[in-house]
Amino acid sequence: MRLFVSEGSPGSLPVLAAAARARGRAELLISTVGPEECVVPFLTRPKVPVLQLDSGNYLFSASAICRYFFLLCGWEQDDLTNQWLEWEATELQPVLSAALHCLVVQGKKGEDILGPLRRVLTHIDHSLSRQNCPFLAGDTESLADIVLWGALYPLLQDPAYLPEELGALQSWFQTLSTQEPCQRAAETVLKQQGVLALRLYLQKQPQPQPPPPEGRTVSNELEEEELATLSEEDIVTAVAAWEKGLESLPPLKLQQHPVLPVPGERNVLITSALPYVNNVPHLGNIIGCVLSADVFARYCRLRQWNTLYLCGTDEYGTATETKAMEEGLTPREICDKYHAIHADIYRWFGISFDTFGRTTTPQQTKITQDIFQRLLTRGFVLRDTVEQLRCERCARFLADRFVEGVCPFCGYEEARGDQCDRCGKLINAIELKKPQCKICRSCPVVRSSQHLFLDLPKLEKRLEDWLGKTVPGSDWTPNARFIIRSWLRDGLKPRCITRDLKWGTPVPLEGFEDKVFYVWFDATIGYVSITANYTDQWEKWWKNPEQVDLYQFMAKDNVPFHGLVFPCSVLGAEDNYTLVKHIIATEYLNYEDGKFSKSRGIGVFGDMAKDTGIPADIWRFYLLYIRPEGQDSAFSWTDLLIKNNSELLNNLGNFINRAGMFVSKFFGGCVPEMALTPDDRRLVAHVSWELQHYHQLLEKVRIRDALRSILTISRHGNQYIQVNEPWKRIKGGEMDRQRAGTVTGMAVNMAALLSVMLQPYMPTVSSTIQTQLQLPPAACRILATSFICTLPAGHRIGTVSPLFQKLENDQIENLRQRFGGGQAKGSPKPAAVEAVTAAGSQHIQTLTDEVTKQGNVVRELKAQKADKNQVAAEVAKLLDLKKQLALAEGKPIETPKGKKKK
């Protein structure tokens, strides 16, 4: 067989990725041809990719070629995969071809490209979310995944065309993009030029016809699709759960101290990367580790799983010695000072550690030395002489953080002796260009020193076997998988585990008494020692791999030490240690249009947040809303204002406050009787579906996406109130008053559910709602899997008051100036912000009502198969109303670019 591909041919991407599967199954020659070369003699125009079979026949559809390769590998066809392939050909390709032509050939950008794509991208995201599987056709990669990945890659490799709200699509795309066959295919076709590599090929192709305009918006489509997929059986099941109420909740487990695993139950051990004690954490540090882990820990407790959440300050190493010199203190004094600062910051942010410890303890020394001795006796420790930088003026070897210079990889002028902050690459200090001693600023010289190394090559097979068993069925984030795969692909090398320092865990070996363990060897052991300081039964957590699920949260730069160095250490120690099952790594959070910098006064740091006057829960909400899960994200003051005033004040807070106020004002503070109509029953089922979706997302640690489920339920609640108008019905006849009671009772129960769903994200707000509604204790501490009636008729609520305050533009502008952040690129101007925040809640209610009514008009016309022009006119009205509503709610509206069609 011979496969013909072309550089810059989009169809060559999936074909090359699929061809990698067929290697060894058949003799395959791959030839690269020009875009004008006619391979298939009977086609009227040149076309690649082409597969010439041994029989002399040709396959010249990318999908057909991929199918052929998969069949060679023994793939068995299934209906779902075939359905995806049909959809790709009939729905995705027309939209995608037009978008690529607009971008590459015509040079258009932004919404001109993304606008037509939103529907198809949302469909993929929604399908992945619904089936709760990592791939399109199930738990394993299929032909459909390769074909759709190849089709989408040229566009989605640019984060601008992969909307952040499509979390399931992001995760799927990144998982496939990090696989070696896909990476090689991308390198072959795009040649590291990105989408521009397609220009020559696409210029030779006929211009694709643009897809017909959509008759409804994506948000409307989503809404209809979700409701339409609820079967009568779904509704009956949901209503049955609703009617059981609190009886359906399991018995409330008593809280124990210390928290210990229980055989036969779900036992979850959660760690957050240990922050360096000498640094005050900024918002990016907080969301990357402790806050993300806190959300998951709180969720696990709501599920009544035995959950231990721990963290602590990483106190040994060169960074501490350097900070001590700067401040004229001893290392111990520095550790005491900054440990207290860290603890205070996390306390203010509401981080619910079961224990927050430190690494400068006798337990740390004992456990680290024990693991080292076991590695030593088993032959996994090497001795070698290392070339090191020595400062003759200071008469000492310079450990990595005592030296700075120019990065040998990217040229960054302030690179440390261990890692470059700009490119992230690990560095040996002697590789630095123009090195300087951080203490005296003199130029150090190279000298030799004997050190100990962890023999990672000798442990590589054990590591790969463990990864092969662990990662496929786990929730490792795509970036964590990619980072570890990259290290293994390059081959592991012995890793130095000692340093010429005073402040650290002593090395218990003759001849090395003047050295300490390298912080990257013993810092991860800190999780174990912190647990040992929490309970003398620590081995029930850390030497119990069969019964404990270990989740570790971190920023992506910490992945090699948690996914490679620490596992190799304990695998070599052969002492039945619990190994990580799930590594949850974030990308980086930037500040406005730059980076956080304490020295330059740029960005909000943890000790400053409480001085802004903005409550901790608002910070939590916004950081979790923009959590950098699939790509870097940026903190923006303008966006914080918009999200607070729209999502919290006008959406979530407005609904919960109205629900409670209706009970107080119209029904004397007692929940009224509820007589559910078919529409109410359907709403119960829809809320249950959204709740189950929330569970599925959080069980997969998709924290940002699960937050959207909360906001979706509150939006439906607002719409439910607007449509049914209980404030009017309460003044009517008996039937109207009964209807007002049902709507109010349903709404206040939705508010009760939201209070529990909010608990992992906004614990103080959650507690406030539960106090206002006088929620029963069991309902506060257990999150049901279905929407149940927790506030039955006759339940008396407490005093209801607003949950959130509006953020004013002047207030935010002052904070932006105070923290040194310039206006973020692309952010609305102050006048625009005034416009989006000026609308009152009554105006928003009116617009919401109008959108609902107009949506019903459009749906009815479509159901009647009315004249297309009539439908188009009504759709235009609906779009205009939605635009007005988005503006009133403070949601940014993209101005269409380019010329209008005539």
Swiss-Prot record:
GO (cellular component) term, any one: cytosol
Reactions mediated catalytically: tRNA(Met) + L-methionine + ATP = L-methionyl-tRNA(Met) + AMP + diphosphate
Residue(s) carrying Phosphothreonine: 837
Family listed: Belongs to the class-I aminoacyl-tRNA synthetase family.
Record-given protein name: Methionine--tRNA ligase, cytoplasmic
CDD domains: Anticodon_Ia_Met, GST_C_MetRS_N, MetRS_core, MetRS_RNA
A single GO molecular function term of this UniProt record: methionine-tRNA ligase activity
EC numbers on record: 6.1.1.10
In-chain residues carrying the UniProt-annotated modification Phosphoserine: 827
Known partners and oligomeric status: Monomer. Part of a multisubunit complex that groups tRNA ligases for Arg (RARS1), Asp (DARS1), Gln (QARS1), Ile (IARS1), Leu (LARS1), Lys (KARS1), Met (MARS1) the bifunctional ligase for Glu and Pro (EPRS1) and the auxiliary subunits AIMP1/p43, AIMP2/p38 and EEF1E1/p18. Forms a linear complex that contains MARS1, EEF1E1, EPRS1 and AIMP2 that is at the core of the multisubunit complex.
Domain WHEP-TRS: 843-899
Source organism, top-level taxon: Eukaryota
InterPro entries cross-referenced by the UniProt entry: aa-tRNA-synth_I_CS, Anticodon_Met, Glutathione-S-Trfase_C-like, Glutathione-S-Trfase_C_sf, GST_C, MARS_N, Met-tRNA_ligase_1, Met-tRNA_synth
Domain GST C-terminal stretches: 74-212
Enzyme class, UniProt record, top EC level: ligase
Keyword tags: Aminoacyl-tRNA synthetase, ATP-binding, Cytoplasm, Ligase, Nucleotide-binding, Nucleus, Phosphoprotein, Protein biosynthesis, RNA-binding, tRNA-binding
Subcellular location: Cytoplasm, Cytosol; Nucleus, Nucleolus
Organism: Mus musculus
UniProt keyword annotation of Nucleotide-binding present: yes
Role description: Catalyzes the specific attachment of an amino acid to its cognate tRNA in a 2 step reaction: the amino acid (AA) is first activated by ATP to form AA-AMP and then transferred to the acceptor end of the tRNA. Plays a role in the synthesis of ribosomal RNA in the nucleolus.
